[in-house]
């Protein structure tokens, strides 16, 4: 049974990466077991790096916007390297809260939570949690600005 789940997930992720319509992309990713909110936009070439048997390790809140070529690393890849005993596989969920934006080429590492309304600048590497309404950029990403609270937010 695990084999069929892994095969299905690998095929769906591949199709979703280059789906013609963003709505198709989101539907296929939901079929993979990812939690995706309403009015989410995911551009072309999203890479989700994980072990294929992992389920439910990615949560995208409502109105999240993900630009092209973003990489979400849910787990580092297991291998047979001799350094594996001292550098084990890192595996942790990624949570991107409502109204967050990820710019082109962003890389998000395992265990990161990106807060509500946060903006991650293009080509940034996010290694730690991002507070709500923070604008971060760089490698590693650092806060460069804090946005004011929008009207109507509670």
Residue spans for each PLM region:
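Terminal amphipathic alpha-helical/low-complexity segments used for targeting or macromolecular assembly
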Residues: 1-34, 39, 63, 76-79, ...
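A generic structural signal for short
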Residues: 13-14, 49, 85, 103
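Residues that cap or flank secondary-structure elements
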Residues: 16-17, 52, 88
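Short glycine/threonine/proline-enriched tight-turn/helix- or strand-capping micro-motif at secondary-structure
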Residues: 22, 50-51
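Left-handed beta-helix
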Residues: 32, 38, 43-44, 49-50, ...
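Short glycine/proline-enriched, acidic/aromatic patches that form the donor-sugar handling elements
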Residues: 80-81, 110
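Flexible, solvent-exposed loop segments that connect beta-strands
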Residues: 81-87
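Short proline/glycine- and basic residue-enriched helix-capping loop/turn segments at helix->loop/beta transitions
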Residues: 89-91, 143
